[in-house]
């Protein structure tokens, strides 16, 4: 499959089955995703693999962040969650927004690679990504922020056909205005 075919056929999978890529399979895709554009090669990102009981720890942290008791079931919707973290690096050349863009680029590239490898993926966020309890559950450092999670699992049978309306490039692509 070509890169353009992979991008044009991707979709978000809000429901996935209980199978997930192994750590080794994921690591290979992370290696490839790490090739995104990265000004000054700062690598201002890291990924945290959440499986099994890790998801319950996150569920309790989300519930606490929402002022609820018990555990949120949201992290149990997929057998594997990959937390996407921007790890800001000191740099006079690379502003924080650009470092966050690199981390987001890694996440998006990883989601494309997972989809192309046959896995269902959806990127989930929420206000609790900025909550201190959720940050602590992930072991985030002072220079880090959570951007969200890739929920990863098997693609349910019979759900492959999902057509998005074709994008009109003229709505989003223009030329710079001519000097007058």
PLM region spans:
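C-terminal helix-cap and adjacent tail motif
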Residues: 5-12, 17, 146-180
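Small-aliphatic-rich amphipathic alpha-helix that forms the alpha element of a beta-alpha
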Residues: 33, 82, 90-137
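Short, charged/polar surface micro-motifs in flexible loops or helix N-caps
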Residues: 52-57, 88-90, 132, 156
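Short beta-strand segments
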Residues: 84-85, 151
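Short, electropositive alpha-helical surface patch
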Residues: 134-147
